[in-house]
Amino acid sequence: MIIITAITLIFSMLISQDCSPGYTEVNELCFHDGDLSVIQKMIDNSYVSNIDLGCEDWDNYCGSPNPYMDDQDSWFWVTVDSVYYEWAGNNNGIVEPLELGIQEWNNGRLTSLMCGAYIYCQLSGPIPEEINQLTEATTIRLEYNYLSGFVPETLCDLEINENDYLQFDLGGNRLCPPYPSCSGEGGDFWYQDTSACTEISDVNFDYSTNILDIILLVSFVVEETYPDYQQTIASDINSDGNLDVLDIVEIVNVILEVD
C-alpha cells in the first residue's frame, strides 16, 4: 500500500503543471494573472454596485453577478487549448473569475469571454479601465447585462472588430455617453438604457451639478485628491483631455445657466 501511494505521488508530481511567473495554476492548468485580474474586477464592480434586481429569497439565479455561476450544478464551461472542461462552481458563495460565463484560453491567455445574452452573467457597475490588459482576446460579449458608467477609452487598445457583433457587443446595458469610437455605437444592435446617466459636470454623481461638484473638481485640479476614470470623464467639462481651471470655469457656467 505504501509503495502504491509513493508511485501515485511521484506520478502526480511528474504530470503536475509548473506555471511561469505571472501565471496562476488552477486544476493543473495555467492562467495569466492579468487576465484573471480583469475578470475579477468585473466581478468586484458587480458586487460593489449593489444593484437592486428585485431578487426573491428563493431565486438562486438572481443577483449581480449571477450567483448560480458559483453553484456546483452550473452548466458553464472553460475551454483551455481546445480542450473542453465543465467548470462547475465550488459553492463558496462568491463567483470567482473562472466561474464567470463561458471562456476560452490559449497558452494561458484569455481569448474569448462570452458573458452576453442567454448566458446571464448579470454583470453591473462600470467596465474596468484595465480591460486593455486582455491583449489576446478576440471575442468579448457583454451585451444585455447591467453595466453602467462611462466606457473606458482603453477598450480601443484591443484588436477586436467592434463592427462584428459576434466578436464584440456592449449593447443592451446602461452605459453612458460619450462613447469611445470602438464601443460599437451606431451598430445595428446598439442600444443603451441611459435613463440613470448623469450629465458631464456631475462630478460626484448625485444627479445635480452644484457647488459640491466645484469643490470636488478643484481638489482634482490641485491634485489634492485623484479621480478614478469615471470621475475623470465627468470632470472634463470641455472634453479637452485635461482637468484644469478651464473645466472649473465651465462648471461654474453650467451652474449659472441652471440657476
Language-model segments: residues:
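Sec-dependent N-terminal signal peptides
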Residues: 2-16
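N-terminal capping/linker segments that flank leucine-rich repeat
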Residues: 14-122, 127, 159, 172-201, ...
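Extracytoplasmic/secreted proteins, especially bacterial periplasmic and envelope-associated proteins
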Residues: 34-41, 126, 150, 213-216, ...
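Inter-repeat linker/turn residues at the boundaries of leucine-rich repeats
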Residues: 108, 132-135, 156-163
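Conserved hydrophobic beta-strand positions in leucine-rich repeat
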Residues: 111-116, 138-142, 166-170
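Extracellular repeat-rich scaffold modules on cell surfaces
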Residues: 122, 131-140
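C-terminal per-repeat helix/turn "cap" of leucine-rich repeat
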Residues: 130, 150, 154-155
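Cellulosome-associated attachment modules in secreted, modular CAZymes
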Residues: 195-259
